[in-house]
Amino acid sequence: MNFNINILGTGGTRPLHNRYLTSVLIEYHGESFLFDCGEATQMSLRKQKISWQKIKMICITHLHADHITGLLGIVMLMAQSGNTRKEPLTIIGPIGIKKYLETNIELLRVHKNYDIIYKEIIINKTESILYEDKKKRIEYIKLKHSIDCVGYLFIEKNKPGKFDTQKAESLNIPKGPIRKKLQEGHEVILNEKKILPSDILGEPQKGLKFAYITDTAYSEELSTHIKNFNLVIIESTFKNELKEEAKKKLHLTAKLAAKITKKAKVHQTGLIHFSERYTLNKDLFELLDEAKQEYPNGEIFLTKDGMRLKANKDKFIIK
């Protein structure tokens, strides 16, 4: 299965020597999708030997510096790397993302040899589905922060079940294009008889569901958007002792993050976007402990810069 999630950075506010700013990249069947792009994101791509030329889309949650200041560098990098990019780059984000980037491109006289397609989100007006093809779709959800902010859902569509050769032979379905069409989910007419994919395919395989959520205050409604998701990467900026500060700044504690995923019955929860004050491992493990106490039956882990998660059946395995 070619579905990987790469953790490029896990910090908030400013980059540290061992913790870059929060950014996540999905590799899916030869295409890449980047979520947030703070300062030094391109350094993470280089360290993890990830091709920036394969990035099809960049999705920005909100226009705060720690989530967008690496964007111009990525745009420049794509233009300077051997002039090989042919496909346009799609950039998605709240209103203002186009003005931010185009102003910088103009002021710095950045030369780019490819097109940029902008899709600006007008919260509560823009249709929730931002992108869709035969295998997947990307949606946004409204978050509660000090400025317009969205979370992103990456939803893999259900895949056809296993092909039953014996059933195909019993129905006299010849090998070749007809079988392939049925495997792709299309009905066919054979000898004046309609044959459905369900006639020769097993139960459909459920697609995986992934969510990226940062920065936001606690909201009961948030859980409704991520019900039974396989993996949710969610901000855990503060320890519970700073819950009032989290509330004031419209952020989450690790405990509140776990409360959200517990209510949604999320299978795996990855904590991310740690406050710069937490520089010691013991601080991060305290965040993890607080989350596990809230959701003891959930699979919860700390994300780390350089971590790679690989899809394996109905879950993601840390590599």
UniProtKB/Swiss-Prot annotation:
Q: Which UniProt keywords apply?
A: Endonuclease, Hydrolase, Metal-binding, Nuclease, tRNA processing, Zinc
Q: Which Pfam family is one of this chain's hits? A: Lactamase_B
**Which Gene3D superfamilies did the record assign?**
Ribonuclease Z/Hydroxyacylglutathione hydrolase-like
Q: How is the cofactor bound?
A: Binds 2 Zn(2+) ions.
Statement: the UniProt record of this protein carries the keyword Nucleotide-binding: no
Q: Where does Zn(2+) 1 bind?
A: H62, H64, H145, D215
Q: Membrane-spanning residues where?
A: none
Cofactor(s) needed: Zn(2+)
Indicate yes or no for the key word Endoplasmic reticulum: no
InterPro entries this protein is in? Metallo-B-lactamas, RibonucZ/Hydroxyglut_hydro, RNase_Z/BN
Molecular function as annotated in GO: 3'-tRNA processing endoribonuclease activity; zinc ion binding
What this protein catalyses is: Endonucleolytic cleavage of RNA, removing extra 3' nucleotides from tRNA precursor, generating 3' termini of tRNAs. A 3'-hydroxy group is left at the tRNA terminus and a 5'-phosphoryl group is left at the trailer molecule
EC no. given is 3.1.26.11
Concerning its family, UniProt says: Belongs to the RNase Z family.
The free-text function statement in the UniProt record for this protein reads: Zinc phosphodiesterase, which displays some tRNA 3'-processing endonuclease activity. Probably involved in tRNA maturation, by removing a 3'-trailer from precursor tRNA.
This chain's protein is named Ribonuclease Z
Annotated source species: Borrelia turicatae (strain 91E135)
